[in-house]
Regions:
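Bacterial Sec-dependent N-terminal signal peptides
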Residues: 1-28
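Membrane-proximal, proline-rich intrinsically disordered regions
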Residues: 20-63
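Generic, ordered loop/turn and secondary-structure boundary motif
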Residues: 23-31, 36, 69, 88-90, ...
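A structural signal for short, hydrophobic/glycine-enriched beta-strand patches
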Residues: 40, 48, 55-57, 63, ...
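Secretory-pathway/luminal and periplasmic proteins that interact with or process carbohydrate-rich
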Residues: 54-60, 73-76, 141-152
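Conserved, well-structured interaction surfaces
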Residues: 82-149
Length: 166
């Protein structure tokens, strides 16, 4: 009986230790090695950049920043959500709506930069199309971030430069 218990403990620990070397890669993301400069890998990464716009965390923050801080929306009642700070023109550094928007936008900007580093201009019309799309995506996201987080130009333009570009 004792030997059965020892053998069963041995097999359980053997199975447990063998699971330590399992490395699961994300099924919907590319690794740095997979982004090899081929058209297919760059197309897949560009599609991933477009997927950012479906993220609630991105478009919700963008919508809140533009609409709640304007006269287009009227909130009534009491809420403990951080959107009330936006509605009342109170900027707080830990507003998760704004930090999520910032994070998703910069994730796509960084991905566009990586794609633009790997892509070879003039290789084909399709590759040039991808390069143009990534320049547009990066520029548009930087434009959105400056509109939401940047200061007006007349408020110390020497020190308030907008957003970090890299």
């Amino acid at each position: 009986m004792k030997i059965k218990h020892i053998v069963s403990c041995f097999f359980v620990s053997l199975i447990g230790l063998s699971a330590c070397s399992i490395e699961e890669l994300p099924y919907n993301q590319l690794t740095e090695d997979e982004l090899d400069g081929s058209y297919e890998s760059l197309l897949s990464a560009t599609r991933g950049n477009y997927a950012v716009f479906k993220q609630t965390a991105f478009h919700q923050g963008w919508h809140y920043a533009g609409e709640l801080a304007s006269d287009n929306v009227s909130l009534s009642g009491v809420s403990s959500d951080a959107l009330m700070y936006i509605y009342n023109y109170q900027r707080i550094t830990d507003n998760y709506h704004m930090s999520n928007m910032w994070g998703w936008a910069y994730r796509s900007i960084i991905n566009s930069n990586k794609i633009l580093e790997k892509a070879q201009e003039g290789e084909s019309k399709e590759m040039d199309q991808l390069i143009g799309e990534n320049y547009f995506l990066r520029g548009w996201l930087e434009f959105v971030l400056v509109n939401v987080f940047g200061r007006p130009y007349n408020q110390s333009p020497e020190t308030n430069l907008g957003i970090p570009l890299n």
